[in-house]
Curated annotation (Swiss-Prot):
It is an enzyme of class 1 (oxidoreductase). The keyword Metal-binding applies. Its main location: membrane. The record marks Y161 as: Tyrosine radical intermediate. Its EC number is 1.10.3.9. It is found in: Cellular thylakoid membrane. The lineage of its organism: Bacteria, Bacillati, Cyanobacteriota, Cyanophyceae, Synechococcales. [CaMn4O5] cluster binds at D170, E189, H332, E333, D342, A344. Cyanobacteria usually contain more than 2 copies of the psbA gene. This is Photosystem II protein D1 3. GO terms for cellular component: photosystem II; plasma membrane-derived thylakoid membrane. The record marks A344, A345 as: Cleavage. Pheophytin a binds at Y126. Tyr-161 forms a radical intermediate that is referred to as redox-active TyrZ, YZ or Y-Z. C-terminally processed by CtpA; processing is essential to allow assembly of the oxygen-evolving complex and thus photosynthetic growth.
Amino acid sequence: MTTTLQQRSGASSWQAFCEWVTSTNNRLYVGWFGVLMIPTLLAATICFVIAFVAAPPVDIDGIREPVAGSLIYGNNIISGAVVPSSNAIGLHFYPIWEAASLDEWLYNGGPFQLVVFHFLIGIYAYMGREWELSYRLGMRPWICVAYSAPVAAASAVFLVYPFGQGSFSDAMPLGISGTFNYMLVFQAEHNILMHPFHMLGVAGVFGGSLFSAMHGSLVTSSLVRETTETESQNYGYKFGQEEETYNIVAAHGYFGRLIFQYASFNNSRSLHFFLAAWPVVGIWFTALGVSTMAFNLNGFNFNQSILDGQGRVLNTWADVLNRAGLGMEVMHERNAHNFPLDLAAAESTPVALQVPAIG
């Protein structure tokens, strides 16, 4: 009898935990994806803060030239970063127990892998948690679909690009200046500005900003007045009210006359779908572009493509961009013995003039 009661008590405790995890009445929804998200994002955040403040220099290139990224080694908020793991580690999984000592783990940039892997698992779980909450509330699943765009971008720079280049040392550093350095090196090595997927991403981000500003200003300019001249118009809205808070007909008429009739949406649902889809698709293409350039399927090359009647080169902006890329490539290679191959002007000298006969 005692054993039976203990089993029922244990079962009821587990059932209570399951109901709490999946309850939509909590102030913050947890969900089963949240059970995975919370510890992974906490681990990533704690390790990032400690490494950003106090991590020792990391031998990022694997040539015994450590790069300092933490605050206590002289960096500030702008220049500081969690430096990627060493090129000597390559793509190997490098947890703490794989190193001979904690000092070795820190010297080879182990904290970077710890932060990135926990962060990626955390944002994947956050996306799943968005779907889970939508499912529990009977909503459609497009919120997690929209969130998949930044998730794809983070996966591209932290996971796919290192896989394509053969080392986690090529991943994006976790810092402001490190991000800029990553962008400059990416342009130098892959000519990303001439890649059509990057162009689509720029159109998505800037176009989304433009459309968001246009939509917000149109709505704000066509609010239905419910207050006096001396009160804020925001007091004219009550949460959950059934009436429209702005006059979509007036906004449609204004914008249709400002541009042309068919440039304005007359359907609020299709309008908001467009506002969501435009930047999401653009960022998807950017992530896809970074993922293809990870395997050296680079941007277009129009260098020295225009010649005059005598065969002399007429420089274009493509040539200016190429010269800038060469300069960035030189600055990127800190060690002289690893001179970039695409800058070598002379023919390589063979080690052996002829293959020796065997036997």
